[in-house]
């Protein structure tokens, strides 16, 4: 029985599915973290020379099509990476089944709403300016 828990006996049971899901979650966290490093460096370098207190300067920066794409990619990646992290915290520290389910639903909803609002703002500024 202990061997099955560590995955030495693989007969296609539920354990195999759980292991694959855990591996995908682990890989997704690492990949999004690497992407965020590069996008974060791009963003920091891009706004370094800008007068970020001047509304017009920021609008012109966001209106560039490349910046619209990269800001949207940054937003989606950040929201997904954050969602993955919050999911781990909920799974590790919330033990009541109903609260766990409610927390997962609330987390997913909050992250999706954040991403939609941010993408809407980026695209709206990109189209108007």
Language-model region placement:
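Membrane-embedded alpha-helical bundles that constitute the cytochrome b-like, heme-associated redox core
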Residues: 1-129
